[in-house]
């Protein structure tokens, strides 16, 4: 079944607050095998002008992937997850994610289109501090195979 373009523009309530911890950043950096000391050592991060350790740029996926799941759970979207593959992911960082940040994620459906018998669903997740400071915009495209 093809996705309904009427869902374009639909926004979802912000996520619960996620507090970014040094240990989580270090674990993520280790999983990437990234030795950058700014991800583990507050002094190294301070030497770069940051108030605490910073996260690798792709750390945003920890929050944005979970936040985008509201789309999968939306019965109006009616996405058959068994037919879905991840087509694209982009991050635009407004500033680095830092240890101690208290972040919320708000998800919006940006587009739905059909191409070659597949539906393409693009979502945008805005990561902000709980005070509203923009931190990262994540855009992802899901491909629902053979539904259009």
Locations of the language-model features?
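HotDog/MaoC-like acyl-thioester-processing domains
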Residues: 1-3, 88, 92-148
């Amino acid at each position: 079944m093809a996705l309904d373009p009427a869902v374009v523009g639909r926004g979802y309530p912000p996520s619960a607050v996620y507090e970014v911890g040094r240990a989580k950043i270090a674990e993520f950096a280790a999983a990437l095998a990234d030795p950058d000391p700014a991800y583990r050592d507050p002094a190294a991060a301070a030497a770069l002008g940051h108030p605490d350790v910073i996260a690798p740029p792709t750390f945003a996926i920890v929050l944005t992937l979970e936040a985008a799941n509201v789309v999968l759970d939306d019965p109006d979207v009616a996405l058959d997850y068994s037919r879905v593959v991840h087509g694209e992911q982009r991050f635009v960082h407004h500033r680095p994610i830092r240890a101690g940040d208290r972040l919320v994620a708000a998800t919006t459906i940006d587009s739905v289109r059909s191409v070659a018998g597949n539906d393409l669903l693009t979502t945008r997740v805005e990561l902000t501090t709980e005070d509203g400071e923009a931190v990262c915009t994540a855009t992802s495209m899901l491909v629902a195979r053979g539904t259009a």
